[in-house]
Amino acid sequence: MASSSNYNTYMQYLNPPPYADHGANQLIPADQLSNQHGITPNYVGDLNLDDQFKGNVCHAFTLEAIIDISAYNERTVKGVPAWLPLGIMSNFEYPLAHTVAALLTGSYTITQFTHNGQKFVRVNRLGTGIPAHPLRMLREGNQAFVQNMVIPRNFSTNQFTYNLTNLVLSVQKLPDDAWRPSKDKLIGNTMHPAVSVHPNLPPIVLPTVKKQAYRQHKNPNNGPLLAISGILHQLRVEKVPEKTSLFRISLPADMFSVKEGMMKKRGEGSPVVYFQAPENFPLNGFNNRQVVLAYANPTLSAV
């Protein structure tokens, strides 16, 4: 499911609504929850629960779903993969063991919804949320995933059924050089420059450009955005070897401020930012990508 060929199959059906316009408050009504029976996920990954006692350890969380779709007098589409990124989290943001337990013991199902005339199916976690949790799906309770699967066009005008046949939780430990916003007071309402790479994925938060760091902390404005926009062509994306759907950006050490972020030096000591993306994500940089301001605190929304 993590392979490029499988993801390309998935992409045939993908035309999701914009990240900013959909997903923030899409909760299943309580009267519908009592009638749903979900499945629990299997687990794959390189999880070491001893890491839960180390505050500077980061993990990437992903759910991979398999969905079968069928309609009257239509050929059944079996095994359509849905790649469902949950986010990247460090131990100082929330205990690792508690997060994994909440994800693995949760019950998941799928629902249909319509947005701008298009029909979608969406994987949901049933139950209540953890208000302060950095992973949006756990924080919001029965929050639907922000990445949705479009119903193939030949099913759009017919009655159809869909079935969630498999769900896998993948937990991947990030290398030691990972940069994350720090746990000190700056994380609260501090805004960082960020790159928006996909309408249904959260922006990639970056350290501040050194010249703009003080101004950004005191009064966020267009300064950090212009500073980042001017150097996007210098940023290069690398696929992390032996990791699924995980990429990194090595930032110029003489250009970015890392004082407010956790970082273990590698090579020249440049900060390294990790993010989740589909396996076929282009590696030719961030030219023409949208630059936004985003909160360092993942429980707050980007603007």
Swiss-Prot record:
The keyword Cell cycle does not apply. SUPFAM superfamilies: EV matrix protein. It is found in: Virion membrane; Host late endosome membrane; Host cell membrane; Host endomembrane system. A motif (PPXY motif) lies at residues 16-19. It is a peripheral membrane protein. Transmembrane segments: none annotated. Its main location: virion. Gene3D superfamilies: Matrix protein VP40, N-terminal domain (2.70.20.20). It comes from the Viruses. InterPro entries: EV_matrix, EV_matrix_protein_N, EV_matrix_sf. GO terms for biological process: symbiont-mediated suppression of host innate immune response; symbiont-mediated suppression of host JAK-STAT cascade via inhibition of JAK1 activity; symbiont-mediated suppression of host type I interferon-mediated signaling pathway; viral budding via host ESCRT complex. It holds the Pfam family Matrix_Filo. GO terms for molecular function: structural constituent of virion. GO terms for cellular component: host cell endomembrane system; host cell late endosome membrane; host cell plasma membrane; membrane; virion membrane. Keywords: Host cell membrane, Host endosome, Host membrane, Host-virus interaction, Inhibition of host innate immune response by virus, Inhibition of host interferon signaling pathway by virus, Inhibition of host JAK1 by virus, Interferon antiviral system evasion, Membrane, Viral budding, Viral budding via the host ESCRT complexes, Viral immunoevasion, Viral matrix protein, Viral release from host cell, Virion. Exists as a dimer until it reorganizes at the plasma membrane into multimeric form. Interacts with host TSG101. Interacts (via PPXY motif) with SMURF2 (via WW domains); the interaction positively regulates virus budding. Plays an essential role virus particle assembly and budding. Promotes virus assembly and budding by interacting with host proteins of the multivesicular body pathway. The interaction with host E3 ubiquitin ligase SMURF2 facilitates virus budding. The interaction with the nucleocapsid and the plasma membrane may also facilitate virus budding. Specific interactions with membrane-associated GP and VP24 during the budding process may also occur. May play a role in genome replication. Late-budding domains (L domains) are short sequence motifs essential for viral particle budding. They recruit proteins of the host ESCRT machinery (Endosomal Sorting Complex Required for Transport) or ESCRT-associated proteins. VP40 contains one L domain: a PPXY motif which potentially interacts with the WW domain 3 of NEDD4 E3 ubiquitin ligase and the three WW domains of SMURF2 E3 ubiquitin ligase. Belongs to the filoviridae matrix protein VP40 family. Most abundant protein in the virion. This is Matrix protein VP40. It comes from Lake Victoria marburgvirus (strain Ravn-87).
